[in-house]
A protein has these predicted regions:
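N-terminal subdomain of nucleotide-sugar transferases
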Residues: 1-43, 202-208
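Conserved catalytic-core segment of nucleotide-activated headgroup transferases in glycan assembly
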Residues: 23, 170-242
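Short N-terminal targeting/anchoring amphipathic segment
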Residues: 53, 64-86, 99-102
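Active-site proximal beta-strand in glycosyltransferases
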Residues: 73-75, 94-114
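A charged, aromatic-enriched C-terminal amphipathic alpha-helix characteristic of glycosyltransferases
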Residues: 179-180, 305-312, 318-350
Length: 350
């Protein structure tokens, strides 16, 4: 039997960002591929002391794992929501019983949060243990892209166990295609708009115009060329988006993607790229991002070094050039809405 680990969310505070959307879509796609849920239920361990929480999560995971038999396959979304210091040992135990264990990576925290000065040392140690020990023993790992694969190889994970996803899928109930797109429409920015992640929004050049969707935006600091539309639930957001391109950019500078979040784009596939493409919009990405390779290969967007170059780059596109980008974005978007990329990656797991 093929299973996926179904970890229950304890809180719903992230309902209006894409954090839950990516995991929920993975679960829906693998269900369609015949995977069964393996339920991991936990009490609110946030209210427990560290040791008690670790023991509680380990006991719950062991109980879930006890249902698996030789020949079964288990897919785990990474990082785990209810990871404990005992997880690696428990995974090894079921592997010795003949269970194959695979991971699909959403984030590598060692490349992101663990580099922040504000992250406690115990959290950095946990990240190191989880990412170094747990992924190393996997029977297969789905990474975002070839660049992330190379980082994992440097961490000691055998290359033959690694599969590249290429881009995240994004399911849209009741999808409606958008018509009449033009290169002169505003640039779309969706997602977490808070200062620490999207500080560049307060430093944009006067043109082009930008349409903003998400949480954390300081409207009192909005620029003249910015229009803020508020936040939406992930499944409602695609219908609300209006513009000519979707922007994938992070950090505190419009000159380049900078800081912890900006540098992270060198390695990861931002989920908002999938949102834009699934919604039918071509992308604007940072030229040094991992995603730029996919975008340029598929012809579904443009890549720039700086947002100060964006207006000129768009102006230099002919209407026919832009329509080609739109057509390619819609073609890739159809694949993304169908779950094509995860389905393909699952077939390549050893």
């Amino acid at each position: 039997m093929k299973y996926f680990l179904n970890e229950e969310f304890l809180k719903d505070s992230g309902a209006r960002n894409a954090g839950n959307k990516a995991r929920n879509d993975v679960e829906e796609i693998v269900k369609r591929e015949g995977y069964q849920p393996l339920l991991l239920t936990v009490e609110d361990w946030y209210q427990m002391g560290t040791l008690k929480a670790q023991q509680h999560k380990a006991k719950a995971l062991a109980q879930a794992f006890s249902q698996l038999k030789s020949g079964d396959q288990l897919l785990i979304q990474f990082p785990m929501l209810h990871h404990s210091f005992f997880t690696t040992r428990l995974v090894r135990k079921i592997q010795r019983r003949g269970v194959k264990v695979y991971f699909i990576i959403h984030d590598l925290e060692a490349l992101r949060y663990a580099n922040l000065d504000t992250v406690p040392l115990k959290h950095k140690i946990r990240v190191h243990l989880q990412e170094s020990s747990l992924l190393k023993i996997a029977d297969g790992v789905i990474a975002h892209n070839p660049i992330m694969k190379s980082v994992l190889v440097e961490k000691g994970i055998p290359e033959h166990k690694l599969v590249s996803l290429e881009i995240f899928d994004y399911l849209i109930p009741n999808y409606q295609e958008k018509d009449g797109l033009s290169k002169d429409q505003p640039i779309i920015v969706a997602g977490n708009l808070a200062q620490e992640k999207a500080g560049y929004l307060y430093q944009l050049p006067a043109r082009p115009a930008y349409n903003l969707y998400g949480v954390g935006f300081d409207e009192s600091r909005a620029l003249a060329n910015e229009t803020y539309f508020g936040s939406f639930l992930p499944d409602e957001l695609p219908a609300a988006l209006e513009g000519g391109f979707g922007l994938v950019w992070d950090g505190d500078s419009a000159e380049t993607c900078s800081g912890v979040f900006g540098e992270y784009l060198r390695y990861n596939n931002s989920h908002k790229a999938s949102l834009y493409l699934a919604s039918g919009f071509p992308l604007v990405v940072w030229k040094q991002s991992a995603l730029s390779h996919f975008v340029l290969e598929k012809g579904c967007g443009i890549a720039v070094e700086s947002l100060h170059d964006l207006k000129e780059t768009i102006d230099n596109l002919s209407d026919a050039d832009y329509q080609d980008l739109v057509d390619n974005a819609k073609r890739v978007g159809q694949e993304i809405r169908d779950g094509h990329y995860l389905k393909t990656a699952l077939k390549h797991l050893s």
